[in-house]
């Protein structure tokens, strides 16, 4: 059973571009991928594909076909977004899967992805523009100590510790610490 990276995907583009990009994620639909369409390996959305597409289309205020908008959603990745979208799975299953770079260039979208992998305690930040240029950074999660029970837990830099609960006691007050 792999560790999971969970995070936020923000995609900017035209209606057709965003729709195509969302269609590349494995979903709860049956079938879970669109037959004949290359998809993101081990990259999941936790809902029916059309629900995400309908929500994304509601972000467009202009009726013009070439109008652009942004849409953000939650996704999960087996091991890491890097291994699912950049290097690893896509190369091993190239006839079925594609890289983030290929998808952004084909769909004409730009993307920002932030993930947190709490099992191995790292976070990722990935950007890809509509030409397929990818930038990826990763770093250790930040450690916090619960003020109530002393439990050490980790959060990503994009997560607000005031919005988190201690996995041990459920308290919501933390202090930054150096321990992991």
Language model features by range: what are they?
Residues 2-4, 66-68, 159:
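Short coil/turn motifs at beta-sheet boundaries
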Residues 145, 165-168:
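The −1 position to Zn-ligating cysteines in a subset of zinc-ribbon hairpins
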Residues 150, 170-173:
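Cys/His-coordinated zinc-binding microdomains
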Residues 25-28, 34-150, 178-180:
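Charged interaction segments
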Residues 1-33:
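Short, extreme N-terminal segment that most often corresponds to the first beta-strand
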Residues 154, 173-177:
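Short functional micro-motifs and their immediate structural scaffolds
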Residues 155-165:
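Short linker/helix segments within small regulatory modules
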């Amino acid at each position: 059973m792999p560790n999971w990276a969970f995070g936020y995907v923000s995609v900017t583009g035209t209606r057709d571009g965003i729709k195509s990009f969302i269609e590349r994620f494995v979903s709860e639909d049956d079938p879970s991928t669109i037959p004949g369409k290359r998809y993101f390996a081990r990259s999941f959305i936790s809902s029916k594909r059309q629900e995400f597409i309908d929500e994304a289309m509601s972000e467009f205020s202009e009726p013009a076909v070439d109008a652009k908008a942004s849409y953000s959603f939650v996704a999960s990745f087996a091991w890491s977004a890097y291994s699912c979208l950049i290097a690893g799975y896509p190369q091993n299953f190239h006839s079925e899967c594609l890289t983030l770079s290929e998808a952004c260039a084909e769909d004409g979208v730009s993307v920002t992805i932030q993930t947190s992998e709490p099992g191995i305690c790292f976070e990722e930040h990935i950007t890809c523009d509509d030409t397929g240029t990818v930038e990826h950074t990763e770093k250790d999660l930040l450690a916090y100590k619960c003020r109530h029970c002393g439990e050490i837990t980790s959060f990503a830099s994009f997560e607000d510790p005031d919005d988190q609960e201690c996995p041990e006691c459920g308290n919501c007050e933390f202090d930054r610490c150096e321990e992991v």
